[in-house]
Amino acid sequence: MQAGSAAIVGSQRITSSSLDQQVSNLQQASKPLGSQITLTAAEQPRAVLTWLIRFSIMDQLAADNGISVTQAQSQTGLSEIQSEAASSASQEGYSSATALFLGNGITPQMLPALGTWVAQETAYQTKVNGGKQITSQAESNTVTAKYNKAECQAAKSLNISVSPQFGRLDYSTYTVVAAKNTLSQPAGVPSPASTTGLTPAC
């Protein structure tokens, strides 16, 4: 791992400084929301880095499948996920879609990328469903299976490496989780770090 890198995703380097900037953006935007945002100082970089990596995986999935989306499609994707988030925010203890996004590590500056992520997923689902929207549970199940495989293959091809400072990638959820702490743990005290999703399942 290169010095100053938070993660290496394929040929793309996510620098620690760019991650620090997004974490700062998250903290600034979260201030007015007070106790709604429960991410700890340790969790914030992992939550932000999770999404930066997910965006890169989706970019690779799109490239693998000849998918490109327009700015208009990305804007539609953002509108769709904002609408979904607004309707589910209160159930999850948030006052708005913005609060829900922040609570999951998505800064206001990352929203355009989130819209593209949604648009790319939608375009892939339509493509593998014969160019039409999903209208049945059977179609949904088939498309989901294809999507999960394509996402796994994209992630695997990127040979993702996360700096131990921030944790490791759990491939079962594409989430950056705490890495096993072998330095500061007293003898005989097990680390609470998760061991799921150590490698891609494809």
List each language-model region with its residue ranges:
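Hydrophobic transmembrane alpha-helix bundles
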Residues: 71-82, 107-117, 170-188, 200-201
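N-terminal targeting/tethering segments
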Residues: 2-109
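Acidic/polar surface patches and capping/hinge elements
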Residues: 108, 125, 129-160
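Short, low-structural-confidence N-terminal segments
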Residues: 1-43, 149-202
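Alpha-helical structural motif
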Residues: 15, 93, 120, 143-147
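Secretory-pathway extracellular proteins and peptide precursors enriched for disulfide-bonded cysteines
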Residues: 54, 92, 142-144, 187-198
